[in-house]
């Protein structure tokens, strides 16, 4: 009997990629192109406002290891040697047009001064034509750098850029040692405009500068597992390496972001617990900490939790770094800027959420997880709430004005890998939160501000009462409100008057709230959207997008309705839904 041979293998398993073997046998590796599919059954997301239909599933090709990497044929599963840091697929999205970024009627005013304002040593050098953006110096196509293995440019890149809709989305995606530039508005979005293959380094995190973007210029920064930072301009195919060979900080970059409103400055979180501010146009120099000459008396009391190794106010700004802050000796997993550009929420593997005034180089508050480390963090569009995800499988909501935990959201069965607000489903009363995790699930949560003032029912009371969902503000002692100048608030329950007088600048340490005092918020929707862990979540005006560990980028179309007009008129009981919709019975809605 004639039997067709099996198709050539597609290499997608990250574990096998790292080890070069599976079950003690060498893995045959064949690199293929990206594959886009349109599942017949789809993966619909049923929510109160309608059904989100799966548009497509774009599967990125996983590159084979570089020839210089010797495969380990028989890895020892009990070996304690740590594997090189890697990351699942994450996306950085950007539109070059006037695409609406949010429908949320935000009243947030950016009053924060620019980072480094007042330090003449950081003043930008004058340029002849301000409209022309400075590009990196090196041509990546002609580069002989050992850091870059190969660059693949689409043969019709110029034509595709000229013919595309300026309102369409570009996406930058990492997958192992590859970095792809995709046009998601193209009919052939599975064909990358360019692909960079690095020799050994994996790009862990990346970000696009919204300030400098134009039809002729895009600034992209990438943080790598080697500690090197890659400044990349894809249209001209120019690049520059920052922190080359770890001259400033040799530990891997875990997260990287442009400072809001800045053309040159960005912050990189390193695995050794340091936040480093870089200038993309400055050269590197061997970093020597600029510790204060005096003893602890000259150091602000708040800095016991933030050691300033180099201040942004330093006059020594001829080379990178601009500033260096040490928060801990453990891994910084993520950070996020507040909408008013004043605060920085930082989460660490040590289980702390640290609220910083990064302009003043101070830690204001320290919150602790219920269990384990934090993995991700984001801000609400109005800056009133911070949401975190962690190794305790929980999504946690924190109130910034009240400086306290509002609710714990239970629904994941494994670590939460990403959280995000959906600004097109938020108004002044209700917020939509999304989360994804290692359990391959996508969860949606609706959080109603109006329910904060309802009296809390005892946790043994019937869970059908909606008042058990949110902890009341009256549960906490009185707190000082922040004035318009942005002064932070203190918790009377955590510090005595004597403490306030002796250490007025000491960060407020918030203990873990007990399960009996903290309310539980159930999801309105829970759905398994793949077979591998989900790593990233993004909301757009007309879509919801996720990306996974093995390279699946999935896009759902929103229900066909004017969501920004209709959503604010829905009742809070409808937005909260019932626990049964998400597969969680109503009887499980007691306190966590």
Swiss-Prot record:
Q: Where are the WD repeats?
A: 248-288, 327-368, 369-408, 411-455, 529-566
Keyword Transcription regulation appears in the UniProt entry: yes
Q: Which UniProt keywords apply?
A: Repeat, Transcription, Transcription regulation, Ubl conjugation pathway, WD repeat
Keyword Protease listed: no
Q: Biased composition, Polar residues: where in the chain?
A: 484-499, 564-576
**Coiled-coil region list:** none
Listed under GO cellular component are:
nucleus
What InterPro entries has UniProt attached to this entry?
WD40/YVTN_repeat-like_dom_sf, WD40_repeat_dom_sf, WD40_rpt, WD_repeat_creC_regulators
What functional role does this protein have?
Answer: Component of the regulatory network controlling carbon source utilization through ubiquitination and deubiquitination involving creA, creB, creC, creD and acrB. Required to prevent the proteolysis of the CreB deubiquitinating enzyme in the absence of carbon catabolite repression. CreB deubiquitinating enzyme stabilized in a complex with the CreC leads to the expression of genes such as those in the proline and quinate pathways.
Task: Quote the PANTHER family the UniProt record gives.
Answer: AT02583P, WD REPEAT PROTEIN
Family note: Belongs to the WD repeat creC family.
Q: What is the protein name given in its UniProt record?
A: Catabolite repression protein creC
Q: Which organism is it from?
A: Emericella nidulans (strain FGSC A4 / ATCC 38163 / CBS 112.46 / NRRL 194 / M139)
């Amino acid at each position: 009997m004639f039997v067709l041979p099996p198709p050539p293998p597609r290499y997608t398993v990250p574990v096998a990629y790292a080890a070069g073997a599976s079950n003690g046998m060498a893995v045959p590796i064949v690199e293929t192109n990206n594959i886009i599919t349109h599942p017949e059954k789809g993966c619909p997301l049923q929510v109160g406002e309608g059904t989100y239909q799966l548009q497509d599933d774009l599967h990125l090709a996983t590159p084979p290891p570089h020839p210089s990497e010797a495969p380990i044929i028989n890895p020892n599963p009990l070996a304690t040697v740590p594997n090189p840091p890697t990351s699942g697929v994450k996306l950085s999205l950007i539109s070059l047009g006037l695409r609406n970024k949010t429908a949320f009627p935000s009243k947030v005013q950016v009053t924060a001064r620019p980072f480094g304002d007042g330090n003449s040593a950081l003043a930008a050098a004058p340029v002849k034509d301000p409209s022309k953006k400075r590009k990196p110096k090196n041509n990546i196509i002609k580069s002989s750098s050992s850091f870059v293995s190969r660059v693949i440019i689409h043969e019709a890149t110029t034509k595709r850029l000229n013919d595309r809709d300026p309102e369409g989305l570009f996406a930058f995606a990492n997958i192992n040692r590859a970095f792809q530039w995709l046009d998601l508005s193209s009919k052939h979005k599975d064909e990358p405009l360019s692909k960079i293959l690095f020799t050994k380094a994996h790009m862990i995190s990346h970000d696009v500068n919204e300030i400098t973007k134009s039809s002729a210029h895009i600034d992209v920064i990438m943080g790598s597992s080697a500690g090197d930072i890659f400044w990349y301009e894809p249209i001209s195919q120019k690049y520059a390496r920052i922190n080359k060979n770890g001259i400033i900080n040799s530990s891997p970059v875990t997260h990287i972001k442009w400072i809001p409103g800045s053309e040159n400055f960005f912050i990189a979180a390193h695995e050794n617990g340091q936040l480093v501010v870089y200038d993309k146009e400055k050269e590197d120099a061997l970093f020597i900490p600029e510790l204060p000459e005096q003893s602890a008396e000259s150091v602000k009391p708040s800095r016991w939790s933030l050691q300033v190794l180099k201040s942004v106010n330093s006059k020594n700004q001829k080379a990178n770094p601009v500033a260096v802050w040490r928060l801990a000796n453990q891994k910084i997993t993520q950070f996020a800027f507040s909408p008013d550009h004043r605060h920085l929420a930082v989460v660490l593997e040590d289980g702390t959420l640290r609220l910083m005034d990064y302009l003043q180089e101070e830690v204001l508050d320290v919150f602790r997880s219920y269990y384990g480390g934090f993995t991700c963090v984001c801000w609400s569009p109005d800056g009133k709430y911070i949401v975190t995800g962690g190794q305790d499988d929980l999504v946690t909501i924190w109130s910034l004005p009240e400086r306290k935990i509002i609710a714990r959201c239970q629904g994941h069965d494994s670590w939460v890998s990403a959280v995000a607000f959906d600004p097109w489903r938020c108004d002044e009363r209700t917020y939509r939160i999304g989360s994804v995790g290692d359990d391959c699930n996508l969860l949606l949560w609706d959080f109603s501000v109006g329910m904060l003032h309802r009296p809390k029912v005892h946790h043994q009371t019937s869970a059908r009462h909606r008042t058990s969902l949110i902890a009341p503000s009256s549960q906490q002692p009185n707190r000082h409100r922040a004035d318009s100048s942005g002064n932070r608030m203190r918790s009377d329950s955590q510090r005595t008057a004597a403490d306030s007088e002796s250490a007025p600048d000491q960060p407020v340490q918030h203990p873990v709230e007990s399960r009996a005092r903290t309310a539980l918020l159930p999801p309105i929707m829970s759905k398994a959207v793949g077979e591998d862990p989900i790593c990233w979540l993004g909301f757009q005006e007309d879509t919801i997008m996720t990306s996974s560990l093995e390279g699946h980028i999935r896009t759902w179309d929103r229900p066909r309705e004017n969501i920004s007009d209709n959503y604010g008129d829905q009742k809070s009981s409808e937005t909260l839904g019932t626990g049964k919709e998400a597969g969680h019975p109503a009887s499980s809605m007691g306190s966590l």
